[in-house]
Amino acid sequence: MALLTALDDTLPEEAQGPGRRMILLSTPSQSDALRACFERNLYPGIATKEELAQGIDIPEPRVQIWFQNERSCQLRQHRRQSRPWPGRRDPQKGRRKRTAITGSQTALLLRAFEKDRFPGIAAREELARETGLPESRIQIWFQNRRARHRGQSGRAPTQASIRCNAAPIG
């Protein structure tokens, strides 16, 4: 079995109380088995972790934590070496820049929103021409605006929602 020891033996006895985590000191063979499994799969399933834990005589939650810590260490190493992390997008590409919307663009969009909370593609393209913003950003602006103003006046409720909200008969 792996040895469990206090996180820091140099702490006074009262600081090493029952709330302190124990660290896992694994044998070389346990470390080799953990590392071999990690090299095959950075995110093994619960069944794999349970099987590994049983095979090397370490509690499964400790195996889970070992994998989390190992992934964290690997990610830090990749960042230091500025290599892309497997499965992540290219760090040079990153996210799309945030679109800055001016006061006049906002005013125009608000007027359009008051007229129609669900503009069609033609109306959005016209707004795009008027504001100079891409149509896709106009669409997202309307989605966000509707989400912020949920429950306020908008489209008339559908027959289904009227039936669902009606008082019980009887």
Swiss-Prot record:
Biological processes annotated in GO: positive regulation of transcription by RNA polymerase II; regulation of transcription by RNA polymerase II
Chief place of localization: nucleus
Pfam families named in the record: Homeodomain
Domain of life: Eukaryota
Region (Disordered): 75-100
A GO cellular component entry from the record: nucleus
Misc. comment: DUX genes are present in 3.3-kilobase elements, a tandem repeat family scattered in the genome found on the short arms of all acrocentric chromosomes as well as on several other chromosomes.
Protein's job: Probable transcription activator. Binds the P5 DNA element sequence 5'-GATCTGAGTCTAATTGAGAATTACTGTAC-3'.
Domain comment quoted from the record: Homeobox domain 2 confers nuclear targeting.
The family this protein is said to belong to: Belongs to the paired homeobox family.
Protein name (database record): Double homeobox protein 1
